[in-house]
Amino acid sequence: MILKLAKRYGLCGFIRLVRDVLLTRVFYRNCRIIRFPCYIRNDGSINFGENFTSGVGLRLDAFGRGVIFFSDNVQVNDYVHIASIESVTIGRDTLIASKVFITDHNHGSFKHSDPMSSPNIPPDMRTLESSAVVIGQRVWLGENVTVLPGTIIGNGVVVGANSVVRGSIPENTVIAGVPAKIIKKYNHETKLWEKA
């Protein structure tokens, strides 16, 4: 098995894999593997389910009372960034491709009555506006997807690469675009995906 892994990953890759497995076992025991480097801030508010797997460059930011919750068997690939000041929940058996950004907050509310959202105020000085994000079970987020505050993604949803997701997405659909729209629905009677 060791020779098979060394052949698959190459010598340097195999050494990194062994290092990452050892560090994961020491710091994140219920996780399958977290590939380093990773950047986890406020890990007391970040909960990993069983068999969590990550690629390199994972960045998790739980600011203030923010919570990030991963259910079991979640896999995130390289350079995923998740930021929370309220709540981000990711359901079991979910796959997140590389370079995905998920956030539950904005720098400013951009409402007519909010003077703190003025373009004359630097973005990092604006009032943070938040709304919880919930990603269901068996969801697949494609490469470079952005999930915005207040989004609720139902179970079994597939999100196409480069999509921007906001709002409530019904279960068992395929969505894509900017903003993401439903392009297919799963028909449980025929057991086929059908155009929306």
Swiss-Prot record:
It is an enzyme of class 2 (transferase). Gene3D superfamilies: Hexapeptide repeat proteins. It comes from the Bacteria. Pfam families: Hexapep. InterPro entries: Hexapep, Hexapeptide_acetyltransf, Trimer_LpxA-like_sf. One of its GO terms (molecular function) is acyltransferase activity. GO terms for biological process: lipopolysaccharide biosynthetic process. The keyword Repeat applies. Putative O-acetyltransferase that transfers an O-acetyl group to the O antigen. This is Putative lipopolysaccharide biosynthesis O-acetyl transferase WbbJ. It comes from Escherichia coli (strain K12). The gene is wbbJ.
